[in-house]
């Protein structure tokens, strides 16, 4: 039962517009306050306050407003935010953002209720990310490494295999040596039914479901359900990380759906639009979501975040990827031209960046040659791309022998290093060895970014020799 001191009842609904109710005469409602709407027939629905000013509260109803009458309907303001019961029992299960099961399983029995809005970590108690997370994806592990506590988004385009890549990372990612203490919270935001079916089937068939908690909202649900999905997912991640000492990878897909839901809600409230028609507070809203990641001094657990978004028209300057890039620590960019070549995952390493990678690789963390090898692969592939442009102008026959080697390297790099199978889980040693293998196409004099000692130790021409 709700405390009567906190609950206030009103019945003066002035307007119903889309998923919104406008209630007059409310002087003390708070933003994100939980609301219960009781209809004359006894049916109850839940909602939250999305705006409150001049005695008018705007309530967004989770289940929609269809069938709600302004007359005879009671609106109760409950004096608290939306709380969801959180527990370790949610691993291996599928829930909606309100904590209701979607897998025909029982409700969560044990656990504690938590306000899903949470709070970003205090900067003073943050710990710096330094531990390598192995995703099993060479283009990420080898060149744009993910660290425990980092937030590293994936920028995709319409029709590119972001869903498959997200599911593969969720299945394979681990902190080496602490595999049993690793969990994945997968927030699927406004996904189509076929996408929801794919995620569920993939995790169940691969056995990854045992360590994955899936929080899901569908495309046909009200926009508020899409805005709640990452909040509930990150609330669960915070509980697992900071109460159960687990290393949690939070994957949020698709943040573009989240931002579109924000825009839809903003338009319903008739707010003045900002850049691209999105609300002016979208940057703040995204920051509140992305900053719920990191490590805390004195805590064993951590939250690593991989938000995935679709760039409209493949435009990296669009407000959603643009603002995301300001907040996060790099990006993994998927490329349509690579996808059209049959490369999976189609990661454009030259357009990708992990700003913290340098602090989590090298001797004692991955392997001593990792930094030098990464720098050499970047430099060689950049030159290979430039050489392709030159060959398109003057013809391949006019190139020098060295330039022809770079063309061969570029093709081998894409086909052997970047490309891998959906079920191919490469450890970091395998990734680095493949890097050396493709570099061996180039003359040794071209390997200027790698120490001679590493060449003698790892280059295929010397490997195994004393």
From Swiss-Prot:
Keyword Metal-binding: no
Gene Ontology cellular-component annotations: plasma membrane
Gene Ontology MF term list: ATP binding; proton-transporting ATP synthase activity, rotational mechanism; proton-transporting ATPase activity, rotational mechanism
Keyword Cell membrane (UniProt): yes
Location of the protein in the cell: Cell membrane
Similarity field: Belongs to the ATPase alpha/beta chains family.
PANTHER family in alphabetical order: V-TYPE PROTON ATPASE SUBUNIT B
Annotated protein name in UniProt: A-type ATP synthase subunit B
Gene source species: Metallosphaera sedula (strain ATCC 51363 / DSM 5348 / JCM 9185 / NBRC 15509 / TH2)
């Amino acid at each position: 039962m709700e405390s009567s001191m906190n609950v206030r009842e009103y019945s003066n609904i002035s307007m119903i517009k889309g998923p919104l109710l406008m209630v007059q005469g409310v002087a003390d409602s708070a933003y994100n306050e939980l609301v219960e709407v009781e209809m004359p027939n006894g049916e109850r629905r839940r909602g939250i306050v999305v705006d409150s000013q001049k005695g008018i509260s705007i309530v967004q109803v989770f289940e929609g407003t269809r069938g709600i009458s302004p007359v005879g309907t009671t609106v109760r303001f409950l004096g608290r935010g939306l709380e969801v019961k959180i527990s370790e029992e949610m691993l291996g299960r599928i829930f909606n953002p309100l904590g209701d099961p979607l897998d025909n399983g029982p409700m969560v029995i044990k656990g504690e209720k938590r306000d899903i809005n949470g709070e970003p970590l205090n900067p003073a108690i943050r710990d710096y990310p330094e531990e390598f997370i192995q995703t099993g994806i060479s283009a990420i592990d080898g060149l744009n490494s993910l660290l425990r506590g980092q937030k590293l988004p994936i920028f995709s385009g319409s029709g590119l295999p972001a869903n498959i890549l997200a599911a593969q990372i969720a299945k394979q990612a681990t902190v080496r040596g602490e595999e049993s203490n690793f969990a994945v919270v997968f927030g699927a935001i406004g996904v189509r039914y076929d996408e929801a079916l794919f995620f569920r089937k993939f995790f169940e068939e691969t056995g990854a479901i045992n360590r994955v908690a899936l929080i899901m909202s569908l495309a046909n649900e009200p926009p508020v359900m899409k805005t709640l999905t990452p909040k509930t997912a990150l609330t669960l991640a915070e509980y697992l990380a900071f109460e159960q000492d687990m290393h949690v990878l939070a994957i949020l897909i698709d943040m573009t759906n989240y931002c579109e839901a924000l825009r839809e809600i903003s338009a319903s409230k008739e707010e003045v639009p900002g850049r691209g028609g999105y609300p002016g507070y979208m940057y703040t809203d995204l920051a509140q979501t992305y900053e719920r990641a990191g490590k805390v001094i004195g805590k064993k657990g951590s939250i690593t975040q991989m938000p995935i978004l679709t760039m409209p028209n493949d435009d990296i300057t669009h407000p959603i990827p643009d603002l995301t890039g300001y907040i996060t620590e790099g990006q993994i960019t998927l490329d349509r031209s690579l996808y059209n070549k049959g490369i999976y995952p189609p990661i454009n390493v030259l357009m990708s960046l992990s700003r913290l990678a340098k602090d989590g690789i090298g001797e004692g963390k991955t392997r001593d040659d990792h930094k030098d090898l990464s720098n050499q692969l970047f430099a060689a592939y950049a030159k290979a791309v430039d050489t392709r442009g030159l060959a398109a102008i003057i013809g391949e026959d006019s190139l020098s022998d060295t330039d022809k080697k770079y063309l061969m390297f570029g093709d081998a790099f894409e086909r052997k290093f970047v490309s891998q199978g959906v079920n191919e889980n490469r450890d970091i040693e395998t990734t680095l060895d493949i890097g050396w293998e493709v570099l061996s196409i180039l003359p040794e004099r071209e390997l200027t970014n790698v120490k001679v000692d590493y060449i003698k130790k790892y280059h295929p021409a010397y490997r195994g020799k004393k």
